[in-house]
Regions:
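A flexible loop/linker signature enriched in serine peptidases of the S9 family
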Residues: 3-24, 35-42, 48-52, 71-86, ...
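Non-catalytic accessory segments flanking enzyme active sites
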Residues: 3-4, 16, 28-34, 56-59, ...
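Flexible loop residues that form catalytic
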Residues: 5, 72, 127, 140, ...
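C-terminal substrate/ligand-recognition segments
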Residues: 9, 59-60, 69, 74-80, ...
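Active-site/binding-pocket entry motifs
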Residues: 36, 154, 202-205, 316-317
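Signature of short aromatic-glycine-proline-rich micro-motifs recurring in repeat-based ectodomains
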Residues: 43-64, 113-117, 225
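Short beta-strand element of the alpha/beta-hydrolase
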Residues: 190-202
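Active-site-proximal cap/loop segments of hydrolase catalytic domains
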Residues: 208, 212-344
């Protein structure tokens, strides 16, 4: 299999051709992907398997006539349509493609292990908003579907807490997502609870680039609860607020707007949650890890919104990273004012 790239940078077109070693002048196009392809049109990537020498080789069918592509289909509106992983079979001689498996639209399934060479039997991870992740043996030839693991939710109080997800609009018109997990036992009409914000700002060129990334949201995922999650606070009467915090500007100059966008993001979220009467804006905390910790300290210094902050493992003096940081590619000597203003 031969890979070719036409063009340069992010817009390069990648093609993969099958070549018979006994007829090297004869090629078959099995895959083509434009660098600027929309996320919703991504054709996937070649599937691989372990070769006879233990290395990774392209997965071909038993008779050698087909290869396989795996990927995830995304949709324009992720709040309506969840991502759906898939597997395609491609005939080498003609390039004809057949979809042999795809995740359901009401739960999230992903291929964990392929059991046989022809991808007729596989182990699939399956989860849903109320379905705890487990593994299933799926046989596409016989239709057999058998559960093989029986894991149970260890924190049902937390994962079962009421959640809300919606868009907020900044004064400049930029829209972003916020997710809120309400305290255990809280019901609409109850007094607004105190809230803990947990965030990690990211940089974007514009609204379109933010929206493109937001399309990967998976509404069919089981609510995750990791070791760094603040959601355990819902058991203590707090709402946990996880806002996107987009820092927006021209490529290479996003941080010119860092303080402005940080303040406006948080203000827009607080105003909207206060309007919905699901937080007490007089009792707010803020926290984050790494760049989220750095941004927590900046928010504590540059905004009046929070009574306390938790900053874990951050770098709070950008002059100590003079050769760039995060998406900032200018050196300290090229953007001195930005580096200093972002060093609380």
């Amino acid at each position: 299999f031969v890979t070719r790239r036409r063009g340069g940078g992010q817009n390069a077109t990648t093609t993969i051709h099958a070549v018979e070693l006994n007829a090297p002048d004869e090629e078959h196009l099995v895959y083509e992907r434009d660098g600027d392809v929309e996320l919703t049109d991504d054709p996937g990537t070649l599937a691989y398997m372990e070769g006879p020498n233990g290395g990774r080789v392209v997965r071909t069918s038993t008779d050698g006539t087909h290869v396989f592509l795996t990927g995830t289909q995304y949709f324009e509106n992720p709040d309506q349509d969840a991502p759906r992983p898939f597997a395609d079979r491609v005939e080498i001689a003609t390039g004809d493609t057949e979809r042999i498996w795809q995740s359901s639209d009401d739960i999230y399934e992903s291929i964990g292990t392929v059991v046989d060479r022809d991808m007729t039997e596989m182990i699939v991870a399956r989860q849903g908003p109320t379905l705890y992740p487990n593994q299933y043996s799926v046989n596409l030839a016989t239709g057999e579907d058998r559960q093989v693991t029986f894991n149970e939710d260890p924190t049902p109080e937390i994962t079962g807490a009421h959640r809300e997800r919606f868009m907020v609009r900044r004064p400049d018109g930029f829209e972003s997502v916020v997710e809120v997990t309400m305290p255990v036992g809280w019901e609409t009409g109850d007094p607004a609870p105190p809230a803990m914000f947990w965030f990690y700002p990211r940089e974007y060129d514009d609204q379109e680039s933010y929206d493109e990334r937001a399309r990967t949201y998976n509404k069919n995922a089981f609510p995750s609860f990791g070791t760094r999650s603040m959601e355990y606070l819902v058991r203590l009467g707090y709402a946990v607020v996880e806002p996107d915090a987009p820092i927006v500007g021209p490529q290479g100059r996003m941080n010119d707007n860092y303080e402005h966008d940080l303040r406006n993001n948080l203000a827009a979220v607080i105003d909207e949650l206060d309007r919905r009467e699901i937080i007490d804006r007089q009792r707010l905390g803020l926290g984050g890890h790494s760049y989220g910790a750095f941004s927590t300290v900046n928010a504590m210094v540059h905004t009046p919104f929070f009574k306390a902050g938790i900053a874990g493992d951050g770098n709070y003096n950008r002059t100590l990273t003079p050769m760039a940081f995060q998406s900032e590619r200018r050196l300290l000597w090229e953007a001195r004012d930005v580096y200093l203003s972002m060093s609380p």
